[in-house]
Amino acid sequence: MSPQTETKASVGFKAGVKDYKLTYYTPDYETLDTDILAAFRVTPQPGVPAEEAGAAVAAESSTGTWTTVWTDGLTSLDRYKGRCYHIEPVAGDENQYICYVAYPLDLFEEGSVTNMFTSIVGNVFGFKALRALRLEDLRIPVAYIKTFLGPPHGIQVERDKLNKYGRPLLGCTIKPKLGLSAKNYGRAVYECLRGGLDFTKDDENVNSQPFMRWRDRFLFCAEAINKAQAETGEIKGHYLNATAGTCEEMIKRAVFARELGVPIVMHDYITGGFTANTSLAHYCRDNGLLLHIHRAMHAVIDRQKNHGMHFRVLAKALRLSGGDHIHSGTVVGKLEGERDITLGFVDLLRDDFTEKDRSRGIYFTQSWVSTPGVLPVASGGIHVWHMPALTEIFGDDSVLQFGGGTLGHPWGNAPGAVANRVALEACVQARNEGRDLAREGNTIIREACKWSPELAAACEVWKEIKFEFQAMDTID
């Protein structure tokens, strides 16, 4: 034996497999202000105790592996290991638990959402001892938040750039999302902006396809923006999707957008990846571009109640990585979103400090230490009859985005935009006068129809349209 081997043997190394809970379940641990805290919904395999399951999550997402290894003795596990410090049963489910895990800050690279997720939600989600695993929430410590630059500009700077205050911003996704030529696409952008919208938007899968290459789209949209601004006297924008197959190509598209003088670009941050998103956010900050974020592919990760990752975690990650807008669901439209849970992560996007509130799905108190806020974007299956509810639910600091609810107007795109702008202005005025939007919403819209034939036509088209399905994402 070499002296090194003898030394290891003398301190008690014993080959083999031991229970995770012996090392990683520490119910007496007092969490530190610098720890990253995670709340996991854990469903163990039959026969696996909750303590062992929670400890396995802590181990496999930090320093642990399936067997004892010699090199454990070459570092301080007590300094670097994750710890399952609390377990609580889920009401109504005999074999499901919320397991709380604390991770030392030294486990994570500064300013890297990619590294944070690689550790916390990496291989552990395929662990055989677990039937299902879902990351419900994270507490990001102040010390780690300050290593990120966050959103390129934030809510107040965006309002100052646009010179628009006291109401939600109004947008529209151009439809059909695929198949239009660049010139016809630009025409639709112009008509919507001229009609009164603040923004129009590329859909998430509009990149650079044979029917419309990105450079042509950027040119025609920039022309539409300039023409609409000249006619209305308002600052306008179109979310030019810079998402591409490589980071280099993505930045090239953002550079061209800046050269055209447009105010905002867009990125699909989940499909594009957090490394690409953070790079684009840094470029936008340095070059005066706003950054709109689409969450395409999020439901693959967050739709199932028992497995995956809740969107509130993805929302926090986006605020770290960088984005000025992000899609958040509508509560009232065609896409998933229960009211209290949606408003919970909307507050996490906008507010500087959010208290723990399990009734809204918030597991930890979170401080953002002056990191700029992100505007939530309500988009998907909404129309003029939804305007009072959207104004009441999301408030002024939001973007309300009507795609089919603008372009589906029987008189055309510009009248569709007029209808939405009139409905929004009517709701904001009624709210400012002290009227109850939740109770009087339909009356407010009908009153506005008397002096807006465009709104009256829109109300007639969509008076029967509802999306009444039960949300999957509910409080336990």
From Swiss-Prot:
Gene3D superfamilies: Ribulose bisphosphate carboxylase, large subunit, C-terminal domain, RuBisCO large subunit, N-terminal domain. Keywords: Acetylation, Calvin cycle, Carbon dioxide fixation, Chloroplast, Disulfide bond, Lyase, Magnesium, Metal-binding, Methylation, Monooxygenase, Oxidoreductase, Photorespiration, Photosynthesis, Plastid. Pfam families: RuBisCO_large (PF00016), RuBisCO_large_N (PF02788). Its main location: plastid. It catalyses: 2 (2R)-3-phosphoglycerate + 2 H(+) = D-ribulose 1,5-bisphosphate + CO2 + H2O; D-ribulose 1,5-bisphosphate + O2 = 2-phosphoglycolate + (2R)-3-phosphoglycerate + 2 H(+). The modification N6,N6,N6-trimethyllysine is found at K14. The keyword Transmembrane helix does not apply. Its EC number is 4.1.1.39. The disulfide bond which can form in the large chain dimeric partners within the hexadecamer appears to be associated with oxidative stress and protein turnover. Substrate binds at N123, T173, K177, R295, H327, S379. GO terms for cellular component: chloroplast. One of its GO terms (biological process) is reductive pentose-phosphate cycle. RuBisCO catalyzes two reactions: the carboxylation of D-ribulose 1,5-bisphosphate, the primary event in carbon dioxide fixation, as well as the oxidative fragmentation of the pentose substrate in the photorespiration process. Both reactions occur simultaneously and in competition at the same active site. The basic functional RuBisCO is composed of a large chain homodimer in a 'head-to-tail' conformation. In form I RuBisCO this homodimer is arranged in a barrel-like tetramer with the small subunits forming a tetrameric 'cap' on each end of the 'barrel'. This is Ribulose bisphosphate carboxylase large chain. It comes from Arenaria drummondii (Drummond sandwort). The gene is rbcL.
